[in-house]
Design a protein with these regions (language model features):
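Two-component system phosphorelay core
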Residues: 1-149
Length: 149
């Protein structure tokens, strides 16, 4: 295993250890094969596009007077589902808390959750972009992507 492969393996392991990713991400990786070598990247790219839109919608909805908590909850529910489907564990967890604040119609709690959600999402996005960059570098050298044990 060369330096880049080790770096990729360690980065991915850290994402799991730090709770950014869960087993659902591993399940996505198992669906990737020679016929769809960029499957995970494509799924995550769609997740990012949807998440960017949902976070914007939540931010806009929280700024409305009066606040429509049902609408915000629907956005948080959608974000929770898409996050869970790609294995974004920490984002999923914040969404669950966010939904509780929506149900309680706690505006300040919702605002804090949105900030936390944006923070967790930004961290995840940065870490996944780095993971994909390492994978591309490894492929460019004709090496195989190491699998997680």
């Amino acid at each position: 295993m060369d330096h880049l492969q080790r770096k990729l393996r360690d980065h991915e392991a850290a994402m799991f250890q730090q709770g950014f990713l869960d087993d659902q991400f591993s399940q996505l990786q198992k669906l990737q094969d020679d016929s769809s070598p960029d499957f995970v990247y494509e799924v995550i790219t769609l997740f990012f596009a949807d998440s960017d839109k949902l976070l914007s919608n939540m931010s806009h909805a929280l700024a409305q007077v009066p606040v429509n908590f049902k609408q915000i909850d629907a956005h948080a529910h959608q974000q929770k589902g898409s996050s869970a489907s790609v294995g974004a564990a920490r984002v999923t967890s914040v969404c669950a808390t966010f939904r509780s604040f929506c149900e309680a119609q706690n505006l300040e709690g919702c605002r804090r959750c949105l900030q936390q959600l944006q923070h967790e999402y930004t961290q995840l996005k940065t870490k996944l972009h780095y993971l994909f960059m390492l994978q591309q570098e490894i492929k460019a050298f004709g090496r195989s992507i190491p699998t997680r044990e």
